Amino acid sequence: MSKHELKDKKRKSVDGEDVSKSKKVKKDKKDKKDKKAKDGNDKVKDKKDKNKKDKSKTDKNLKEVQETEAHTGSETAPVGDSTAAAGYVESKELASVPQADVDTFFSENEVAVEDPESLGFRPLLSFSHLNLHSAIQKEISKFPKPTPIQAVSWPYLLAGKDVIGVAETGSGKTFAFGVPAINSLMSEKSTPRGVKCLVISPTRELASQIYDNLVQLTDKVGLNCCCVYGGVQKDSQREQLKKAQVVVATPGRLLDLIEEGSAKLAGVQYLVLDEADRMLEKGFEEDIKRIIKETKSDVRQTLMFTATWPKEVRELASTFMRAPVKVSIGNRDELSANKRITQVVEVIDPFKKEKRLLELLKQYQSGAKKNDKVLIFALYKKEASRVERNLKYNGYNVAAIHGDLSQQQRTQALSEFKAGTANLLLATDVAARGLDIPNVKTVINLTFPLTVEDYVHRIGRTGRAGATGVAHTLFTEQEKHLAGALVNVLNGAGQPVPEELMKFGTHTKRKEHNAYGAFYKNVDLTKKAKKITFD
């Protein structure tokens, strides 16, 4: 139909001519067909004009992909290839893995998956089973194989599902959420603008550690990553936020930046709550909810990683996650200690603890062990300061992290300990959760923590990433109300229970009600030990 005919038809319709419904439908279909044909001709012409310009660029990209495939042994794609950078398709190599091998993997690693949509993804037992952006594939291929939490969670995360990961610290959780998050950002044809990936962490030290790991990936793909936390000036953080696509933050400082308008989260596509149980313990629940409200649920994929799975964490997850897949590594519903850690509990007079500490340091740092890293836990910062001075007086090169130190001093202390400049680190519980300090051979609990949960998290600083370790605990009569709970943990990990500890009784304080007080249960040592469930 010509343009003049269309104009005439339109003019007649305006003048009041009655056009039947069936004719109008035919007309619309014909117009769409004509337009589609015209657009197709235009595209063919544009494509011919562009072919010569793009030929050299295409050849170059093809060469890069072929080189990467030769290096990693898997198919990869350049930036902007949505096949490799977004979504998940099981590889033929993974599909050919015998089911017996998959069953063995699940059994040996105590893996449990709650899959509400029954997707049934198989774990990625090798990096060659992945199809990621080439730079990311190359970076992670430096490691021997995916950790259990990575192997099981990656398929669901790459498929865009909300995921809850329940696993001990030191299990590779940062790359478990970092690799799919950054890979998904690379599916965009141009560099994304604004904050797209947000990781919330309970402490400054843990936030810095997560940042150090993620920047290994973001630097390789041309994205900007920044870390915001309290205790330092905001000016540099404001500037970094303007350019960052990936942000790691503590709740308090992030809320400050949101309220002043420096942090805008409406574009967040990937939200991660790391150490969620720890954040709730520290009273960040309302802060977390306020931060989440700044994001848009219809575009947000949400991840939660936690070492334990108490009622409070379950309730938080139910409020903002959509049909999440829950991946548990080990028996994380109940409190249990790493079985690779040798636990030694010594009942002692409280006034003899610091003298005994010096004896233990000679024991654990003698001969071939003189350079071994030892992490010492005190309960309060005043105690930590006093013990630090005493150790330095006795000639020990000790670093310390506790509340009386500035953020710069704490960061410096951690750096010295990681580098081996100082082989003793004295800490309060600020360092008990989440921090990945490699090669800690021994943990000494100079003063027992306020809860057995904190005890388990403290000793978890050793025996990480498949290694073994020793945890030596000085226990006094002042902590006798925790004796029963400690006995349960020792029995659950197959560790010896000293007779002196049994003298304090074997009741376990389960819960306390404002009106009815505490409820207790007795430990029957003739039966197989049951682990404690905190609800």
Curated annotation (Swiss-Prot):
Annotated GO CC locations: nucleolus; preribosome, large subunit precursor
Top-level taxon of origin: Eukaryota
Residue spans of biased composition, Basic and acidic residues class: 1-21, 34-72
Pfam family, one: Helicase_C
Region (Disordered): 1-82
Any one biological process term the GO annotation gives: rRNA processing
Domain Helicase C-terminal: 352-505
Listed Basic residues bias regions: 22-33
InterPro entries xref list: DEAD/DEAH_box_helicase_dom, Helicase_ATP-bd, Helicase_C-like, P-loop_NTPase, RNA-helicase_DEAD-box_CS, RNA_helicase_DEAD_Q_motif
Swiss-Prot/TrEMBL domain comment: The Q motif is unique to and characteristic of the DEAD box family of RNA helicases and controls ATP binding and hydrolysis.
Protein name: ATP-dependent RNA helicase DBP3
Underlying gene: DBP3
